Amino acid sequence: MLLPLAPSSTRRATRAARGMSAGWCAWSAGDASLMFSLVVRPDVNMHAFHGLPFVAAMGMMDVLAGTAATPGLGLAGKVGIQWPSDIVCGAPAFETSLARVAVNGGAGAAGMFGAVTVDIERSALSELGVDMADEALVEALAAAVLTRVGAWAVAANTPQGAAGPLAPVLGEYFDMVPLLGRQVAAVSPTVCRSRWRVCGLDIWGRATIKTDAGEQEFPPEAVRIRGL
């Protein structure tokens, strides 16, 4: 269900998600951005919820870059995931923000849920030549995210999924992150800005980054990266 959402009411939409069923979606269109909030309720354990932002970003990529079954918007090679969950464009540097993807989790009478919030830059859409009605684009993206989350939830309840939230999808996620193996600009609480290299990712979503002190593992909340 798509509902109109006032531009300033993202937090209210997240609170409202407590009582909403999976697939509830509210959206708003502004001059500079297009935003939507989607409720997902994957039947996974609490630890697996850590993987939701990554999986939501993969759902976005299914529409933007396409899959083996559908070409999507035909943007393969032009868009990618900026670890952990934002969507970027501007190949080959991939330094232009296309969409910010975040997930706020919670629990209510209906159980645990995730409120997926996506904020899309209109200027980036224009640069990519995307000419699609706002509501149709939101419907396509929300449906793809919901489908991705559903498939991931099934895999997360297998022995492979028990190893870590990204274990069932890590290889595919890896292929969607164009900055892996490349030098990036990194910002952390201890380093204002530095040129580091992203070497790999693990099944919990941590990035292995080669710094001046050697290779170190960082969770998403500890460091932010962008293309150079």
How would you describe each model-predicted region?
Residues 22-43, 52-57:
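DPxDG-like acidic metal-binding loop motif
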Residues 9-10, 25, 34, 207, ...:
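A broad, low-specificity signal marking well-ordered, structured residues that form hydrophobic/aromatic
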Residues 1-26:
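Flexible, acidic active-site loops/lids enriched in D/E/S/T/G that coordinate Mg2+ and/or position polar
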Residues 2-6, 44-78, 89-228:
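Long, positively charged amphipathic alpha-helical accessory segments at protein N-termini or as interdomain linkers
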Residues 85-87:
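RNase III-family endoribonuclease catalytic core
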Residues 11-13, 37, 82, 113-119:
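Short beta-strand segments
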Residues 16-17, 42-46:
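Short, charged/polar surface micro-motifs in flexible loops or helix N-caps
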